[in-house]
Amino acid sequence: MAILATTNQSKKSIEIIPAGSYAARCYSMIEIGTIKETFNGESKERKKVRITWELPTEMITFNEERGEQPRVIAKEFTLSLHEKSTLRGFLESWRGKSFTDKEAQSFDVTNLIGVPCMLSITHKTATNGNTYANISSVSMLPKGMDCPELINERQELTYDNFKQELFESLPDFIKEKVVMSKEYQSLNKDTNEVPF
């Protein structure tokens, strides 16, 4: 009898979101926390946030029991509003205006949950040959264009008000990042247990 190792073929293949422009609505902000990243051989600690949007005009059935649901797409950012930060430029484009110096000192990104926008999605092929949908840009919705109301339940995970139930409902790859953060480790310093 053989024990065969295969690629994970039990996972249902879902077609990637076609490239194009979409009305979208933010429904999730996950504070990943401060994690170590290595880029070009240099390691740095960065505080990260994951922002997720639903595309309410792009419905798909992921699970027969739940029926049609909107497709979703996410982007991870370093949580910084420095004038050269990616997040700042992205949010200014979404809001349609620049941050004032006062706003940039302390802006609660969770205020954008439920706010509609226009997302441009492009495709990129990774070195492993897989093609992924990526958010290339954001803008305010064009004048006169509507975006349906939020369909997914609002998700907000912060260390100020850590919701264990929400954390446990996240995909494993996100939880793995969260548990590596300084903030999570500080929150759970009395236990060495991996929560999933």
Name each region found by the language model.
Residues M1-F196:
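Short beta-rich binding modules
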